[in-house]
Curated annotation (Swiss-Prot):
It comes from Influenza A virus (strain A/Swine/Wisconsin/1/1967 H1N1). It is found in: Virion membrane; Host apical cell membrane. The keyword Transmembrane applies. GO terms for biological process: protein complex oligomerization; symbiont genome entry into host cell via pore formation in plasma membrane; symbiont-mediated suppression of host autophagy. Cytoplasmic tail plays an important role in virion assembly and morphogenesis. The modification Phosphoserine is found at S64. A lipid is attached at C50 (S-palmitoyl cysteine). This is Matrix protein 2. It is a single-pass type III membrane protein. Keywords: Disulfide bond, Glycoprotein, Host cell membrane, Host membrane, Host-virus interaction, Hydrogen ion transport, Inhibition of host autophagy by virus, Ion channel, Ion transport, Lipoprotein, Membrane, Palmitate, Phosphoprotein, Signal-anchor, Transmembrane, Transmembrane helix, Transport, Viral ion channel, Virion.
Length: 97
């Protein structure tokens, strides 16, 4: 005897959606929130580099460089970059015995 004959299979009417009362405001609100969440998640995944770069660097404006010679601007940029660069000497190698 096959295992399939031993298992109860739901009849077709049990598979259908039982929420025929879709005029319920809670169901409508949940649907709208779900769709908005999906749209925002997709946009976040598509543009996350632009969005987070804007938050990280765009909101923290540095000092104004108006009237400052280009050589001093370049020196300032270099200092800022050196402060950001990771120094490999800070890492500790642990050897387990």
């Amino acid at each position: 005897m096959s295992l399939l004959t031993e298992v109860e299979t739901p009849i077709r009417s049990e598979w259908e959606c039982r929420c025929n009362d879709s005029s319920d405001p809670l169901v409508a609100a949940a649907s709208i929130i779900g769709i908005l969440h999906l749209i925002l998640w997709i946009l976040d995944r598509l543009f996350f580099k632009c969005i987070y770069r804007r938050f990280k660097y765009g909101l923290k404006r540095g000092p104004s460089t108006e009237g400052v010679p280009e050589s001093m601007r370049e020196e300032y940029r270099q200092k800022q970059q050196n402060a950001v660069d990771v120094d490999d000497g800070h890492f500790v190698n642990i050897v387990l015995e």
